[in-house]
């Protein structure tokens, strides 16, 4: 397959934290990114530098926390004003991933706070078949207007809280949202609460 680009953008997937997502279980995602002309590479955040020309850096559901030094690497990557092309960090979370104070503090600097629990849907029209954890999410009109992302399914998702919309030169916004008929299941949720959940 020919790629008609001078510089192929790089998607760099960070490793070294017993990630739940890896090359072995996200081959379809990697194939999709490569079909969009990304070069997909992996690297160890602790022992290696972020690969040159990385445009998207993915933190793929780690199960152990990042060190302060690794977080500083991420900040340097995002604050590099010598780069012409925009850069992004994509973080995936799991509902039971546990406490990660360094990674959580970094995300909160950018206006996002991962919450405990599992997002579930009560409206059968907004879920896949009869799986309440297979939630259909809605693109936000102002960001993804005129797009083709209207049938996106989010499985086993952790809820995220947006802490602010603007803070100094940082803007935070939602790309996709769940419906008002969703609720969050936590380890403290009783059977009675699950049978008659409080929704938004």
Report residues per predicted region.
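Short, surface-exposed patches at the edges or C-terminal ends of soluble domains, predominantly
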Residues: 1-200
